[in-house]
């Protein structure tokens, strides 16, 4: 039976950093809870509490929640409203689809002065004649009942008709309580009958007859007979058919909607779930182990993980090199390597990889390395029987390279002794040459060079005359 534990509350308090002492809202719906416990001690600051769709049969252990404003107990097995007097700040109470038949128990809510909303839809008491008038007259602080606002005229009318409504309500309540007592007795007798049937079925099983047989003289144990696989398969099919018939009978059997029937259905489903889990675990356990070596001693090649691999025969170094493509992000602690003289076995997450080697190797001289970039496992295994081989003469690669790529000569200038007279000195005056003007355009105009004219013999330079610009 699931219970309210500290671990459950902390998991449901992720929005509050998993702190439960300062928790103001928590949802514990659909947890198959049958009791309310520990919440009033661990979560004193609670304001909103969701407990809908469980198997709670009694309101308890909430009286210390002084700040609780909203309590949702819909879809449970509650039959009586009680133990809510200590919830001083309670404003909304939801008891939709429960088994509240004792309507007089709402008198305990008169002390909850801040109660404004109450939901009793889907309860047996909601079918009583005069149910709404009785609740409105009994709880004057209510503003909403079953999602409908209580008007002032409705309250006045309910207070006027309260004596007659109270009498009719008591009669209907007593009739319902007698009916509930009969249902409880019927459920109890039904449960006892099922227990007796289960005991009988256990006693009918082979190997048990309530007696013990001892023979002092007979000390030789009986030989163990191996079960016949055909008989075993037949027993399994018969057992499955019996379970299917039992399940069909359970769901086809008519039953009343009572707290006991809800509990019975829940426990039946829980047993079925546990049996399926146990059967699945049994099937997993029954899985035969992988055969790596036959009874004759022959080693098999196995690659259960379906990993890519390559085995290279390095003749120059006289060794085998195995490259196994292990997953890159797999932790090395999950890899186990075992090198034997004739084969190698690698366990990757408990899944074997086994490979038979072409020749014997030295296990003590072998080494295993793993790449940090690709994650591949490289196992180097020297051969046990060494073969003396002459090393191949290295081809003159250097000479060919020198022929193809001759060495570059150094960039040093060699100077010769030359007669200085034979050396022509450059004319520094003619370094910049005048650009010749070329014809431009279709008319080919030419710019004539201006030549300096010589002065005539009778030219007199008069200083008073300004120069021509």
UniProtKB/Swiss-Prot annotation:
**Pfam name, any one:** LRR_9
Which parts of this chain are annotated as the region Disordered? 179-290, 436-469
Q: Which Gene3D superfamilies match?
A: Ribonuclease Inhibitor
* Cellular compartment(s): Cytoplasm; Cell projection, Cilium; Dynein axonemal particle; Cell projection, Cilium, Flagellum
Q: Which residues form the LRRCT domain?
A: 114-135
Q: Which GO terms describe its biological process?
A: axonemal dynein complex assembly; cerebrospinal fluid circulation; epithelial cilium movement involved in determination of left/right asymmetry; epithelial cilium movement involved in extracellular fluid movement; establishment of localization in cell; flagellated sperm motility; outer dynein arm assembly; protein localization to cilium
* Keywords noted in UniProt: Cell projection, Cilium, Coiled coil, Cytoplasm, Flagellum, Leucine-rich repeat, Repeat
Where are the compositionally biased (Basic and acidic residues) regions? 179-213, 261-286
> Where are the annotated LRR repeats, by residue?
20-43, 44-65, 66-89, 90-110
Which Gene Ontology cellular component terms are annotated?
cytoplasm; cytosol; dynein axonemal particle; extracellular region; motile cilium
Q: This chain belongs to which protein, by name?
A: Dynein axonemal assembly factor 11
Which protein family is named in the record? Belongs to the tilB family.
Q: Which InterPro entries does the UniProt record give?
A: CS_DNAAF11_C, Leu-rich_rpt, LRR_dom_sf, U2A'_phosphoprotein32A_C
Q: Which organism is it from?
A: Xenopus laevis
Write out the coiled-coil annotation as residue ranges. Answer: none
PANTHER family in the cross-refs: CILIA- AND FLAGELLA-ASSOCIATED PROTEIN 410-RELATED (PTHR18849:SF0), LEUCINE RICH REPEAT PROTEIN (PTHR18849)
């Amino acid at each position: 039976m699931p219970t309210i534990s500290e671990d459950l509350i902390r998991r449901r308090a992720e929005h509050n950093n998993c702190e439960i002492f300062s928790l103001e809202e928590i949802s514990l719906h659909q947890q198959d809870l049958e009791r309310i416990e520990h919440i009033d001690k661990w979560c004193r600051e609670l304001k909103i509490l969701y407990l809908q769709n469980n198997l709670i049969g009694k309101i308890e252990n909430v009286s210390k929640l002084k700040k609780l404003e909203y309590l949702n107990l819909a879809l449970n097995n509650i039959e009586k409203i009680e133990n809510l007097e200590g919830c001083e700040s309670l404003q909304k109470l939801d008891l939709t689809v429960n088994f509240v038949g004792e309507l007089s128990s709402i008198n305990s809510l008169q002390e909850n002065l801040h109660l404004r909303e109450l939901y009793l839809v889907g309860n047996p008491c909601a079918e009583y004649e005069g149910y709404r008038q009785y609740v409105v007259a009994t709880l004057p602080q209510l503003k909403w009942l079953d999602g409908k606002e209580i008007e002032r005229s409705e309250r006045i009318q309910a207070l006027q008709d309260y004596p007659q409504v109270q009498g009719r309500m008591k009669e209907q309540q007593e009739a319902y309580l007698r009916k509930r007592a009969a249902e409880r007795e019927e459920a109890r007798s039904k449960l006892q009958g099922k227990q007796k049937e289960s005991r009988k079925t256990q006693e009918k099983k082979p190997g048990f007859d309530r007696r013990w047989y001892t023979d002092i003289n007979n000390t030789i144990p009986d030989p163990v007979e191996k079960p016949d696989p055909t008989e075993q398969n037949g027993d399994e099919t018969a057992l499955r058919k019996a379970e299917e018939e039992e399940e069909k009978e359970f769901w086809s059997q008519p039953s009343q909607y009572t707290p006991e029937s809800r509990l019975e259905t829940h426990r039946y489903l829980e047993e079925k779930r546990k049996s399926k889990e146990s059967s699945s675990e049994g099937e997993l356990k029954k899985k035969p182990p992988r055969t790596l070596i036959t009874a004759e001693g022959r080693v098999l090649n196995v690659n259960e993980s379906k990993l890519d691999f390559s085995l290279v025969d390095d003749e120059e170094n006289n060794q085998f090199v195995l490259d196994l493509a292990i997953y890159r992000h797999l932790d090395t602690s999950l890899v186990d390597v075992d090198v034997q003289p004739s084969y190698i076995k690698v366990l990757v997450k408990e899944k074997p990889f086994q490979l038979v080697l072409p020749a014997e190797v030295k296990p003590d001289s072998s080494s295993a390395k793993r790449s940090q970039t690709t994650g591949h496992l490289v196992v180097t295994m020297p051969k046990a029987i060494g073969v003396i081989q002459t090393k191949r003469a290295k081809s003159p690669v250097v000479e060919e390279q020198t022929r193809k790529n001759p060495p570059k000569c150094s960039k040093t200038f060699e100077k010769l002794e030359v007669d200085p007279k034979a050396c022509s000195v450059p004319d520094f005056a003619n370094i910049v040459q005048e650009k010749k003007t070329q014809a431009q355009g279709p008319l080919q105009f030419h710019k004539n060079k201006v030549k300096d004219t010589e002065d005539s013999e009778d030219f007199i330079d008069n200083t008073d005359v300004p120069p021509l610009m």
